[in-house]
Amino acid sequence: MVWRVAYTCLLFLAACSSPTQDFQTKLVPIGNFRLGQIVPRADAELTKGPLSRTASHEEWVAAVNDAFKDRFSRFDGGSYYHLGITVNGYILAKPGIPIIVAPKSVLIFRVIVLEDHTGKVLTEKPYQITVIEQLKVSSLLGSGYTSSREQQINNLAQQAALSTETWLRRQPWFEGPDTIVEL
């Protein structure tokens, strides 16, 4: 019984960590991955969820571009890969009723991966990922109370980049030979 409580506490603490906290630890390569270009965009019919604050296409594109550049420009593998990111929908939590109704922010986006050397699209179809704002002590109040709209956008974009990295690490694409020619 005690180990279950300890394990639950450990999971809770892990969920409370920042999406950029791992920047402080040693970088573990993703095979031969090196970021080529990021092509962020927001769907022409970007879906704003119910009871959400409003965010523009431009705000999402800028936040996603910055978060993905920060996360993926750290990798210096031997082959370039390009990431296409499309924001499809979001909910930016408004203030709710603390503890009783604490709305969560959500981001839905799709990712495609293109290998630079061959020009081949590695994803058969765009891979959809949904991120929900991280669990924090302040989540009991709801991020609508504790975070500005801009902070919510940036936090979701950082979580999107982290979720994409986690997904990329499970793919077999980055085990081939290096293709970058150093002159």
What are these regions (language model features)?
Residues 1-17:
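Sec-dependent bacterial lipoprotein signal peptides
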Residues 16-62, 173-183:
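A structural "domain/chain start" motif
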Residues 17, 140-183:
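C-terminal/domain-edge helix-coil "capping" segments
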Residues 50-59, 97-99, 142-151:
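Second-shell loop/turn segments in exported
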Residues 53-78:
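N-terminal, post-signal-peptide region of Sec/Tat-exported proteins
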Residues 65, 127-132:
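A beta-strand/beta-hairpin structural motif
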Residues 69-73, 77, 92, 161, ...:
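Sec-exported extracytoplasmic/periplasmic mature domains
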Residues 75-123, 134-146:
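Surface-exposed short loop/turn segments
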